[in-house]
């Protein structure tokens, strides 16, 4: 049985291993390998697009909590998302590990973001995010003042397999290349 949150090692590598197992289990091993090659090619293209940003820090965030108690999930170093950031030649913009690959924090914690902040949120969180970004506390954040916040499309999924990983890498590269 696959473990979506391995206690050690890379969640990215675990995703690849699990994908290969699934492809073999359904008799589509060759197709699975082609998808993984597409993933490798996609990451290489995104890394090339980000060459001028190599070594810069990028923190990935998504909304958490509720509209009445907003919170932010920061993806930690042991997440698949942070692993992709590193594979693109960038550095983690959020430190620490968390059991499920992200830590839920309040707005004030964003003051620790040094570098870029990529905010990923689906349309149903628009109101919550709007409420956060309109506050004076948000507007005073160093990363906001430096105009280093980017949003990725609402259909970007951060917990999936190869195809969603490709979409995340492509959108991150496009947003940071603007």
What is the predicted function of each stretch?
Residues 1-2, 58-62, 93, 118-121, ...:
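Structural recognition of the beta-strand scaffold that forms the well-ordered cores
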Residues 1-67, 155-178:
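Extracytoplasmic substrate-binding proteins
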Residues 4, 98, 123:
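Residue-level "edge-of-site" marker
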Residues 10, 14, 113-178:
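Structured C-terminal subdomain patch of bacterial secreted/periplasmic proteins
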Residues 71-103, 155:
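Alpha-helical, coiled-coil/dimerization segments enriched in small aliphatic residues
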Residues 104-114:
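Short helices/loops that flank or line small-molecule/ion binding pockets
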């Amino acid at each position: 049985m696959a473990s979506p949150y391995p206690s050690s090692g890379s969640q990215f590598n675990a995703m690849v291993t699990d994908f290969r197992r699934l492809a073999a289990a359904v008799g589509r091993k060759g197709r699975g390998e082609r998808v993984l090659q597409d993933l490798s090619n996609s990451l290489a293209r995104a890394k090339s697009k980000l060459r001028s940003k190599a070594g810069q820090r990028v923190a990935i965030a998504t909304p958490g909590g509720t509209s009445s108690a907003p919170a932010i999930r920061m993806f930690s170093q042991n997440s698949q998302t942070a692993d992709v950031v590193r594979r693109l030649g960038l550095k983690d913009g959020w430190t620490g590990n968390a059991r499920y690959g992200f830590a839920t924090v309040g707005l004030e914690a964003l003051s620790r973001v040094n570098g870029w902040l990529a905010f990923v949120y689906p349309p149903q969180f628009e109101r919550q995010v709007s409420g956060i970004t309109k506050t004076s506390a948000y507007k005073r954040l160093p990363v906001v003042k430096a105009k280093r916040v980017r949003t990725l499309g609402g259909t970007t999924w951060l917990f999936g397999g190869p195809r969603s990983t490709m979409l995340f890498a492509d959108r991150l590269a496009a947003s940071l290349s603007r």
